[in-house]
Structures are given as structure tokens and as C-alpha cells.
């Protein structure tokens, strides 16, 4: 983690690929570790809006607990411990979740710092909307992100029953804008936001304002294949190029479409990339390739 100014690192949304990477790294680094102590800083605002427990003493319940297993789905990571306790992390719209071998690499600021009995640490600082919650097994059932991400809605990565036939069935069940089908409360998959959406529809050659009811079977196939390819590429590349993993290392995935293409030409056809406000965010696309 040397040389990285964490305080100035750009906030970036965390989607399914980055969540999977974090969960795997947390498993490698924290499994079986026992919590010695915790510290909370600058948490009042997050507590008021529900991003952290309203009672700071709720985190005391984690002291003395050992990490049993880590599960993840969508944008949510659930660190399960003994004594029926959990630390629920959902970095959704930006968070620095970092592992430290000793106190020498601890950042100046954090929202939650967890110290383990072996002298290692986990620090979390939310840089956007997200969740850092201490919860019993029973309490975890009622947490919004748990209900949202650990639901019947399929994950586009890591689940064998998410086939093209299943994807087509979900798309056909209700005609809606293509963005609403990929991102948000009515999405047919979990774990994706505007960043992944822009890449997926660009690679699939689909205009951002299309309705799912107008898609041909070939276009649905392209959408399904593009989703798989983009997400797996991000996982293999260690996440987005402007995102930091658990060890403070930046990802290497450069988006094929998004804000990085501002004032650029399409690498496939040479047309000027355009931007529109759509579905609660800015969407970049190629007006020639995406129809």
C-alpha cells in the first residue's frame, strides 16, 4: 500500500466484480481471526442516514468473536462470526475497505477500525452510499441490502442456473427500459450499476434508451454474452482501474465505455461518443454502433 494517498483516491462505485474480489481477499486474510477491539470515527452522519448502526455500542458485540466464513452476493459482503454475529459490508457507491498487517499502514481516517488478536487490522471508510453494520443473525435478515442481494434475483456471475434461457425469460416477463432491466430495483440481475451498464450495452451494440420488448433474440444473446464477458474481464483484471482492493492495489480493468470516453471517438467505427442523462445518471454511448 505504499505511495497511495487514500484520502485523495477517487470515489468509485463498487459492483459485483469488485465485491467478489474483496470477499475472496477477506476470506484469505481474515478467516479464523478473533476480534480484539474496535474504533469508530466520524460516524454521526452515517448513523443518522442508516449506513452504520445508530448505537455505537452495537459494535462491541463483535469483540471476542472469530471470523467463521465470508459470503457475498450482488454488492454485499457478509462476514459471519461465531456467537451468531455478523459484520455486513456494502460498499455500493464507494468505500475503502483495507487490510493492514500492522498499525504502520493504518490510514488517518476511518469510520470503523477492527483490530484482531494477532495485531492485524481491517479499516472501512465509506466514501459514498453504503453500509457498515454489526448485526446478529436475526437482525441481518432485516437489513435492506441483505434482502436485496440475497434474493431470488439471479447473479450474472457464479451461478450455474443463470443461463441465457433464464435471462431471456426474465427480460420477456416485463417490458421496460434496458437500463431498468440491468440496474436498480426492477433489474433482472443483482450487483450492477451504471458503470457496468454502459460497458455491457456498448459491447452488445444496444442503444441505452431501447425497451426490452423491442430486443430481438440475437440482441438478447449479445446482451447476455456481453454481460458475462465484461464482468469476468473485470474480475480477472482485479477490478476497475480506479478502484482499490483489500490490499490497497488498484484494479487494471479499463472500461470500454464510460466517462473515460468523454470527447473521444468510438474505437470501432470512429463516430464521436455522445453523453445523455438517463435513468438517474450520465450514460456514454456510440450513436452509430448502438442501435
Where are these regions (language model features)?
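Noncatalytic, beta-rich nucleic-acid-contacting surfaces in large DNA/RNA-processing enzymes
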Residues: 29, 120, 135, 160, ...
Amino acid at each position: 500500500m505504499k505511495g497511495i494517498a487514500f484520502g485523495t483516491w477517487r470515489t468509485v462505485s463498487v459492483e459485483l466484480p469488485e465485491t467478489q474480489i474483496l470477499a475472496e481477499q477477506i476470506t484469505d486474510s481474515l478467516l479464523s481471526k478473533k476480534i480484539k477491539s474496535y474504533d469508530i470515527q466520524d460516524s454521526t452522519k452515517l448513523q443518522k442516514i442508516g449506513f452504520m448502526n445508530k448505537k455505537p455500542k452495537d459494535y462491541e458485540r463483535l469483540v471476542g468473536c472469530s471470523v467463521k466464513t465470508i459470503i457475498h452476493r450482488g454488492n454485499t459482503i457478509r462476514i459471519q462470526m461465531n456467537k451468531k454475529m455478523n459484520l455486513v459490508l456494502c460498499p455500493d457507491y464507494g468505500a475503502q475497505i483495507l487490510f493492514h498487517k500492522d498499525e504502520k499502514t493504518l490510514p488517518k481516517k476511518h469510520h470503523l477500525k477492527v483490530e484482531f488478536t494477532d495485531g492485524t487490522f481491517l479499516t472501512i471508510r465509506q466514501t459514498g452510499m453504503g453500509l457498515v453494520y454489526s448485526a446478529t443473525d436475526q437482525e441481518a435478515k432485516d437489513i435492506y441490502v441483505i434482502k436485496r442481494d440475497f434474493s431470488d434475483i439471479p447473479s450474472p456471475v457464479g451461478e450455474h442456473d443463470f443461463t441465457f434461457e433464464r435471462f431471456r425469460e426474465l427480460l420477456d416477463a416485463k417490458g421496460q427500459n434496458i437500463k431498468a432491466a440491468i440496474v436498480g430495483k426492477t433489474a433482472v440481475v443483482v450487483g450492477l450499476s451504471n458503470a457496468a451498464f454502459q460497458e455491457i450495452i456498448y459491447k452488445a451494440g444496444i442503444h441505452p434508451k431501447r425497451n426490452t420488448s423491442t430486443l430481438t433474440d440475437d440482441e438478447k444473446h449479445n446482451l447476455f454474452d456481453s454481460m458475462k464477458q465484461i464482468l469476468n474481464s473485470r474480475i480477472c483484471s482485479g477490478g476497475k482501474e480506479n478502484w482499490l482492493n483489500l490490499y490497497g492495489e488498484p484494479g487494471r480493468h479499463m472500461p470500454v465505455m464510460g466517462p473515460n470516453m468523454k470527447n473521444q471517438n468510438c474505437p470501432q467505427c470512429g463516430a464521436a461518443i455522445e453523453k445523455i442523462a438517463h435513468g438517474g445518471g450520465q450514460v456514454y454511448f456510440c450513436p452509430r454502433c448502438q442501435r
